[in-house]
């Protein structure tokens, strides 16, 4: 009976689904560039058994640890758009060159932080759920994420004590604060056996956060950038729609609405009414560009990335359930439709003050060429928001924190403004997807926000300045400012130390040989002396040098004495002078990071000489 019960248990779905970290290990990835494979894990984790809800993740281990361990969770928006956008077009270590080739991203955020990309909500990207079970509210989305993290940290407990940051862009401006609130609540309600998660900060790029402030900014930005000519027939039509939007926003019930139909129509009409005779319209994600889709097929990397992720061998490498994930699309319209069918929750702007006051730092950043979530709307929401005893960027009543000009390696990069644990960064010449345009500049920004200290690692720091004042040192992955340069120096020091240690050991061995030969010769000489005196009738013999040795010896005592010497030497063979003299502490003392130089080198990526440049040519109205 017991045997049958055991057999049933082993064959049960619960047992079959039990997995370990090893099951998620990514052994290799198709098209990977030359060099060591980064340490990766990927696959599905169940978050809702009743609806077959599973979230897909792709995790990259950091290449270096600066002063402490950090994990950054990245989420794209939509709603319903895959975080593989962030992994392969923005902040991840690889970019897709074509559908069969990956290249290193010079400016990836994984140098000092573990990266965890999650396709969420269920049904997004490689995640899946029963077709009638898409989510309708942000509380449910947040609950799934907390469940996911509980299971993920149980699988990978070495990361549970990391400083935790949640980052993303666009409609993730709604996801991120709601998920952060759920984590703060979870930390307050856990029992003594559970570990609180160290939520340190949030980073939101071109985020959809405050509809009340951001809907009106569409026409403000269009006029400011010359997309619409004031007084024109197009302007008249759009102004009428914008007035209808303003009336709806004035309705008290709209204060808690994330999506307002009358306001959504303004952007759609702007795209339609400004279409050129060549049937091109402005790219809503990068106004420097025009194309027939108004940016819905932008950026150019999207097509090869889609073909890459649809390859069978790629899905196999990422440990995907083949029966559930037959393909990949960037955005699942059904996920977005169901989340926007009704109001999914309170606008995230209302959550930010409590999060900041609870000790969570927040960084908002914007690319100045984005229309759909433009910087004017973000700046307006900050201006109106009240937190920590002040309004906006007040440092004291009536006095606002200054905008500090930011230069990166000699070029005007944008500006910083910050007060009371909120930081805002504007990027010049940047689109809706800022890390796509400026990977190294965003890496510089994130390293400073998460307080990376490279003092114990080395490398030539990037030249990053605010108002001409050089900022604390950090390195940003190119040949002139990277920790890889320091790694090479450490390796050279290690090799030099090893050769010195080997030489020292060789000298010690030579000394041992010389001493041994000398002692051996001495005893041979003494033995012969005793043998030559053995014929004297008055001999008393020699006292043994070993305790317990006979006082009277014959002519054969010389050989016996030498034999005892050899035996004594063999008995002490374990006391290896060479081994004693090879002090590995010398190697450890070279630098605090040198002990792990070999291990770090396994994950160091060869740097490229490419400089950041604006990405153009090529062209969603989803918020990615």
From Swiss-Prot:
Membrane topology: Single-pass type I membrane protein
Residue positions of the active site: 170, 370, 432
One Pfam assignment: Peptidase_S10
Originating species: Talaromyces stipitatus (strain ATCC 10500 / CBS 375.48 / QM 6759 / NRRL 1006)
EC class name: hydrolase
Lineage, top ranks: Eukaryota, Fungi, Dikarya, Ascomycota, Pezizomycotina
Highest rank taxon of the organism: Eukaryota
Stored PANTHER family: PHEROMONE-PROCESSING CARBOXYPEPTIDASE KEX1, SERINE PROTEASE FAMILY S10 SERINE CARBOXYPEPTIDASE
Protein known as: Pheromone-processing carboxypeptidase kex1
Compartment list: Golgi apparatus, trans-Golgi network membrane
Originating gene: kex1
